Amino acid sequence: MVPCNKEFVTNMFSVEGKVALVTGATGALGKVLAKTYGYNGAKVVLTGRNQGKLDALVEEFKAEGIDCTAISADPAKEDDVKKLIADAVKAYGRIDILAVCHGFNKPANILEQSVEDWQYIMDADCKSVYIICKYVAQQMVDQLGGKTPESGKGGKIVVATSQRSKRGMAGYTGYCTSKGGADMMIASMACDLSAKYGININAICPTVFRSELTEWMFDVNSEVYKNFLKREPIGRLAEPEDFAGYAMFLSSDASNFITGAACDCSGGYLVC
């Protein structure tokens, strides 16, 4: 048990010197979280499927003083993930934080959606989360050297799912199913990992946030924007930066007693 002293209180949100692996790093959310870790003193491993975009991101980050490297990988492929982890450990010696920020959706009415498209969504949003979390957790366990650390001291895993894991929507059968499955998978993984290995795993469940794919929803004069805002007590749609603090909290000692949670960060969407 850590006493409530000045050192603990002033360092509880620190990720200084940690190694953070961020998937979907070239996307809006992944880039913000990777920068947040880097600005706060973590070494960052950026991963995604587009090496060109990753290389550009490394150049940008290093110009801002962030210690980082980029490794391309498909998180839905076991061999890719195993190599990714091996290369990350070769670069920085360990992995302390995993932030899972990749995802995919292809909306369609259930009567029109092909089984192949549904399966692709499940692979991208659920199977890939299982694979990356499984093998990073194994790396975190290996780093312990047989010791059982205090809660949260074995590693932190943060997975971006969605408020759609909690509420259905027409045309989103595949997406809602995959995100709901990911939330329950995270809860079950916590039962496997937290007490024995000190690895905390949690989900953040955001509402719609600005990205290349959702930019069209941010036209304040559109009916889509106006209708969505009726369900947002906070009065606006989200920016990816809105979730940086939540991810930092779940990646730091401040959240050592939190695991298996699907944390709502929807601007109040779920209460209306």
Swiss-Prot record:
How does activity change as temperature rises? Optimum temperature is 40 degrees Celsius for the forward reaction.
Activity control note = Menadione, hydroquinone and 2,4,6-trihydroxybenzoate are not substrates and inhibit the reverse reaction by 33%, 31% and 49% respectively. 100% inhibited by 0.1 mM p-chloromercuribenzoate and by 0.1 mM CuCl(2).
Q: What is the first-listed, main subcellular location in coarse terms?
A: cytoplasm
Name the domain of life this protein comes from: Bacteria
Q: Name one GO cellular component term.
A: cytoplasm
Gene3D superfamilies linked:
NAD(P)-binding Rossmann-like Domain
Record field: pH dependence? Optimum pH is 7.8 for the forward reaction.
Q: One matching Pfam family, short form? A: adh_short_C2
The UniProt record lists the EC number as: 1.3.1.57
Keyword list (alphabetical) reads: Aromatic hydrocarbons catabolism, Cytoplasm, NADP, Oxidoreductase
Class of the enzyme per the UniProt entry, highest EC level: oxidoreductase
Per UniProt, subcellular location reads as:
Cytoplasm
**Can you cite a GO biological process for this protein?**
catabolic process
Query: Which reactions does this protein catalyse?
Result: dihydrophloroglucinol + NADP(+) = 1,3,5-trihydroxybenzene + NADPH
Enumerate the GO terms in the molecular function aspect: oxidoreductase activity, acting on the CH-OH group of donors, NAD or NADP as acceptor; phloroglucinol reductase activity; quinone binding
Q: Which family does it belong to?
A: Belongs to the short-chain dehydrogenases/reductases (SDR) family.
Please give the function described in this protein's UniProt entry: Functions in the pathway of anaerobic degradation of trihydroxybenzenes by catalyzing reduction of the aromatic nucleus prior to ring fission. NADH cannot substitute for NADPH.
Q: What else is known?
A: Constitutes greater than 1% of the soluble cellular protein.
User: What does the subunit section of this Swiss-Prot or TrEMBL entry state?
Assistant: Homodimer.
- The name this protein carries in UniProt is Phloroglucinol reductase
